Regions:
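A non-transmembrane, solvent-exposed segment enriched in polar/low-complexity residues
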Residues: 1-32, 36
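Amphipathic alpha-helical repeat scaffolds of TPR domains
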Residues: 3, 42-53
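Alpha-helical repeat scaffolds
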Residues: 34, 62-71, 97-108
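N-terminal "domain-start" segment that seeds a small globular fold
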Residues: 81-113
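Short active-site neighborhood of thiol/selenol oxidoreductases, capturing the structured segment around
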Residues: 111-139, 152
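Structural microenvironment flanking redox-active thiols in thiol-disulfide oxidoreductases
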Residues: 134-173, 185-191
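Thiol/disulfide oxidoreductase modules built on the thioredoxin-like
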Residues: 174, 184-217
Length: 217
């Protein structure tokens, strides 16, 4: 259904507002159903994973109560600990300062966040496939038409290995901005501290690395 909406958006740009309203309503309904299923099956591995997936849409007090009601082994599982980390962490939002975290490039070289000092940053969480050709071309053009002294684009990819990160970089050939990952998947700071779930999630900062825009999807 979402693909049909995106197709409509391309073919009927004059209906953009109405199509976006429909899309938002679909997302809201999907989230409502996912949360209900997460609560119902929270004591199972798949339900706990769904609970983590919907964490950003659940009040933390409620989420804490649900987690506390689960068997100890579920609470101490990887996903249970990820949910606890989410609960114990204040997520970044507009007005927050970007928080560097250890990660590497596709060449397995530690990414140096210090090189970004004094520059605006556009940090993206995944999403190159989701954004389509138009979105990828926009990023390429933005990178080429801006000065690296003013703006850096950093793409975090949720890879499980350096080989996976390399293959992603090779697949999206021609994208010269930085590709990075820490291979921690759901336990990564990009998921816990930054609160990323939907792809792409984008953070635009000012030159002091204060987040001025955050967008999802």
């Amino acid at each position: 259904e979402t693909e049909n909406l995106f197709s409509l958006l391309e073919n009927q740009p004059e209906s953009k507002d109405s199509i976006i309203d429909i899309y938002n309503a679909m997302i809201e309904e999907a989230n409502r159903k996912n949360i209900a299923l997460a609560f119902k099956y929270a004591s199972t591995p798949s339900g706990l994973a769904r609970l983590f997936m919907t964490r950003n849409y659940i009040d933390k007090d409620t989420l804490r109560q649900v987690l506390a009601s689960l068997p100890t082994d579920m609470q101490k599982s990887k996903m249970g600990l990820n949910i606890k980390a989410h609960l114990d962490t204040e997520q970044l939002s507009v007005g927050s300062t970007l928080v560097p975290f250890p990660c590497v490039t596709e060449e397995n070289v530690e990414f140096d966040w210090n090189q970004l000092k004094g520059k605006q940053i556009l940090l993206l969480y995944g999403g190159l496939g989701c954004m389509g050709d138009e979105g990828r071309e926009y990023l390429k053009t933005l990178y080429k038409q801006t000065n690296r002294e003013d703006l850096e684009i950093v793409l975090y990819w949720p890879s499980s290995s350096i080989e996976d990160l390399k293959s992603v970089k090779e697949h999206y050939v021609g994208n010269d901005y930085a590709f990075v990952s820490d291979f921690k998947l759901d336990a990564s700071p990009i998921r816990i501290k930054y609160g990323c779930q939907a792809t792409p999630t984008c953070f635009l900062t000012d030159k002091d690395h204060i987040i001025v825009v955050k967008s999802e999807g």
